[in-house]
Amino acid sequence: MHTPLLDLTGLTREALTSLVVEQLGEKPFRARQLWSWLHVKLAQHLDEMSDLSIDFRRKLSALSTPLRPEVSTHQISRDGTEKWLLRLSDGQQIETVYIPEDERGTLCISSQVGCTLSCPFCHTGAQGFARNLTPSEIVQQVLFARRTLAARDKRVTNIVLMGMGEPLYNYEAVRDAVLILLDDSGLAFGTRKVTLSTAGLLPKMEQAGRELGVNLAISLHAVRDTLRDELVPLNKKYNLQALRAATLRYPLKSGRRVTWEYVMLHGVNDSEDDARLFVSFLKDIPSKINLIPFNPWPGVPYQSSSMTRIAAFQKILYQAGFVTVIRDRRGEDIDAACGQLKGAVQGARPRPPGAS
């Protein structure tokens, strides 16, 4: 029976050590060398790994293959934001976005081809859902960006899982990928530098809190159940009361806050009454709010709230004591802004119950 070849970059350090020692019969230090080549030196080929014996490299070659994505398109926005459309080994395509700032560079990575959810204002959700990404396909976005940007003296300092997909519907792969990103002997992103975003898949959200300890961002978008049922259909399964209760239980590390993402839709969710309901919803939850001017895409029935309306909404939240930021429309001219990513989904499949 044919055994699929591994991509070594998708193995946690523990899994890689087990493979090298138990399956290949090598010493543990060989696993450490291999890990360093993959996640510190960012090697792309076994031939580059000059301090590994030829015999060891032959063993690795027999059971593994690098599944590096190919660049289909690369766009750079007027504001410096960059977007890559990456082709995977099966021909599916995902989008990865780099957002440069003065003191940091944030990489927005995808976790699915398409999205399990079907939020009607989001271009990704409109594409349907094809499949989950593997751990290596998630990690490879970071390795690719680090190599590519380093050649231009740019750094990736922060990771946000806010690209295509609902990360928690692909939790096992996302967990392994995040553990690889966090590993101190490799890419070494601190837990404060990685943000996991979810629309509120509550059982997995609580599991992520226990197992990963990274920053949490929740795509809220409405503070009335009837409206959130429409904008975020997952709300029909896990409503606002359940979401609030789960967030209160979430094991936040000292000094950290939950980030709430709220897209501002003209005449839909942007009233002052909505802002006051938002304040009530956040009671006793250490929170930061990102208000996101809606980024339109062809055929969508929504419009963005005016900046005057957004500022009035912000003022109510701010006066209640919450840090509230109006997010810049980074990358809007290349469709790289929030809600605009679409990739190229082939053979979309039905979504799981409760996702739409």
From Swiss-Prot:
<comment type="similarity">
    <text>Belongs to the radical SAM superfamily. RlmN family.</text>
</comment>
<feature type="binding site">
    <location>
        <position position="295"/>
    </location>
    <ligand>
        <name>S-adenosyl-L-methionine</name>
    </ligand>
</feature>
<feature type="active site" description="Proton acceptor">
    <location>
        <position position="95"/>
    </location>
</feature>
<keyword id="KW-0408">Iron</keyword>
<keyword id="KW-0808">Transferase</keyword>
<keyword id="KW-1015">Disulfide bond</keyword>
<dbReference type="GO" id="GO:0070040">
    <property type="term" value="F:rRNA (adenine(2503)-C2-)-methyltransferase activity"/>
</dbReference>
<feature type="domain" description="Radical SAM core">
    <location>
        <begin position="101"/>
        <end position="332"/>
    </location>
</feature>
<keyword id="KW-0479">Metal-binding</keyword>
<dbReference type="GO" id="GO:0046872">
    <property type="term" value="F:metal ion binding"/>
</dbReference>
<keyword id="KW-0004">4Fe-4S</keyword>
<feature type="binding site">
    <location>
        <begin position="219"/>
        <end position="221"/>
    </location>
    <ligand>
        <name>S-adenosyl-L-methionine</name>
    </ligand>
</feature>
<dbReference type="InterPro" id="IPR013785">
    <property type="entry name" value="Aldolase_TIM"/>
</dbReference>
<dbReference type="InterPro" id="IPR048641">
    <property type="entry name" value="RlmN_N"/>
</dbReference>
<dbReference type="Pfam" id="PF21016">
    <property type="entry name" value="RlmN_N"/>
</dbReference>
<feature type="binding site">
    <location>
        <position position="122"/>
    </location>
    <ligand>
        <name>[4Fe-4S] cluster</name>
    </ligand>
</feature>
<feature type="binding site">
    <location>
        <position position="115"/>
    </location>
    <ligand>
        <name>[4Fe-4S] cluster</name>
    </ligand>
</feature>
<dbReference type="InterPro" id="IPR040072">
    <property type="entry name" value="Methyltransferase_A"/>
</dbReference>
<feature type="disulfide bond" description="(transient)">
    <location>
        <begin position="108"/>
        <end position="338"/>
    </location>
</feature>
<protein>
    <recommendedName>
        <fullName>Dual-specificity RNA methyltransferase RlmN</fullName>
        <ecNumber>2.1.1.192</ecNumber>
    </recommendedName>
</protein>
<dbReference type="GO" id="GO:0019843">
    <property type="term" value="F:rRNA binding"/>
</dbReference>
<dbReference type="InterPro" id="IPR004383">
    <property type="entry name" value="rRNA_lsu_MTrfase_RlmN/Cfr"/>
</dbReference>
<dbReference type="Pfam" id="PF04055">
    <property type="entry name" value="Radical_SAM"/>
</dbReference>
<dbReference type="GO" id="GO:0000049">
    <property type="term" value="F:tRNA binding"/>
</dbReference>
<keyword id="KW-0698">rRNA processing</keyword>
<keyword id="KW-0819">tRNA processing</keyword>
<feature type="binding site">
    <location>
        <position position="119"/>
    </location>
    <ligand>
        <name>[4Fe-4S] cluster</name>
    </ligand>
</feature>
<keyword id="KW-0411">Iron-sulfur</keyword>
<dbReference type="GO" id="GO:0005737">
    <property type="term" value="C:cytoplasm"/>
</dbReference>
<dbReference type="GO" id="GO:0070475">
    <property type="term" value="P:rRNA base methylation"/>
</dbReference>
<dbReference type="InterPro" id="IPR027492">
    <property type="entry name" value="RNA_MTrfase_RlmN"/>
</dbReference>
<dbReference type="GO" id="GO:0002935">
    <property type="term" value="F:tRNA (adenine(37)-C2)-methyltransferase activity"/>
</dbReference>
<feature type="binding site">
    <location>
        <position position="197"/>
    </location>
    <ligand>
        <name>S-adenosyl-L-methionine</name>
    </ligand>
</feature>
<comment type="function">
    <text>Specifically methylates position 2 of adenine 2503 in 23S rRNA and position 2 of adenine 37 in tRNAs. m2A2503 modification seems to play a crucial role in the proofreading step occurring at the peptidyl transferase center and thus would serve to optimize ribosomal fidelity.</text>
</comment>
<keyword id="KW-0949">S-adenosyl-L-methionine</keyword>
<dbReference type="InterPro" id="IPR007197">
    <property type="entry name" value="rSAM"/>
</dbReference>
<keyword id="KW-0963">Cytoplasm</keyword>
<feature type="active site" description="S-methylcysteine intermediate">
    <location>
        <position position="338"/>
    </location>
</feature>
<feature type="binding site">
    <location>
        <begin position="165"/>
        <end position="166"/>
    </location>
    <ligand>
        <name>S-adenosyl-L-methionine</name>
    </ligand>
</feature>
<dbReference type="GO" id="GO:0051539">
    <property type="term" value="F:4 iron, 4 sulfur cluster binding"/>
</dbReference>
<dbReference type="GO" id="GO:0030488">
    <property type="term" value="P:tRNA methylation"/>
</dbReference>
<keyword id="KW-0489">Methyltransferase</keyword>
